[in-house]
């Protein structure tokens, strides 16, 4: 079990202000990201986008090719159906000058399922659209 670290009112207010101040730019960032098709085994351009964004924000970026032979004998490994030859992982790390507090790890994936029949979409799947305060688009 992990202990909760309290967030004081000043820190909470600073976080809320930072979100509000950067909302438009982050929404634009997400829209740019959604415009990049990233179906499974075709994630390269989306990974390049994220790696560049991490570098621009000052993160140390580790971008490496995933070797199937390193994984195939691990417990829980499942069969890969498709071309895994270009599979990569992109990791961004922020290393502060002074270590204070705890670490935070955010992990995710960026591949999306196929779009299906385009005529079933109200808007093109890779063209973000904001409706009722929510962004719609493949991967949003």
Show where each model-derived region lies:
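Acidic/His- and Gly-rich active-site-bordering loop/insert found
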Residues: 2-138
